Amino acid sequence: HDLRSGRPFPEFDFPQGQDFDRTVNMTNWDLFFYTRQFYSMDTEFQLAAVTKMLSYPISIASVLHQFSPYSLNPKGPVTLEGLKSLAALRYTLYPLENKTISSTKDRPMRIFILGARAEAQLPGHVWKQLQYLFPEQMFELHFVGPECLLNKEKHQYVTSSTPAVKRVDETISFVYHTDFFHVLHEAQDFFPYDPYLDVFFCFHPGFGAPETSAS
């Protein structure tokens, strides 16, 4: 097993803050790693291991970032309503370009991940890669779903009547909600929503699964 080989793992020494004068290219993994100054990975194994770990945070970043491959173009790969949402979110994410936004940023941006499971088990330094791409912004990641909070010692999922909070640092924190989103939404636990400060991701929604057709 590679973990028992005794070799160093420099590919997991992730870069930290991004210099303001260095542009990130998110067209593909190779260009992203190069422009973010990741360790140069020589093997497919290294590349597969690192991309698997970074898949969730960088997928989110690739949608929100101003240099996203999903550009604000009516003929692009997102819907018109999606373009409106991205425009509002980027207005918040880039305050130096939008001087008036400071009066509205009274809380962190909330990223809701619905049906979270593997996403909620990633360590903080991995999710921190998302925040490094938006150095002016604080984030709250809200993991929502009955399998979002794992007791690693007992190897079982935990149910809690109140949100569990984990603070990574002053710029990013995790909030675990162990119920279904529609239950929490109907209870108005997340109100009020703000199109400039809230965004939702469903990585594994199962919308087309037969067992969900009744609901």
Annotate each predicted stretch with a short phrase.
Residues D2-V199, F203-A209:
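Positively charged, amphipathic N-terminal segments that serve as targeting/anchoring signals
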Residues E211-S215:
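C-terminal substrate-binding/active-site "lid" region of AdoMet-derived donor-dependent transferases
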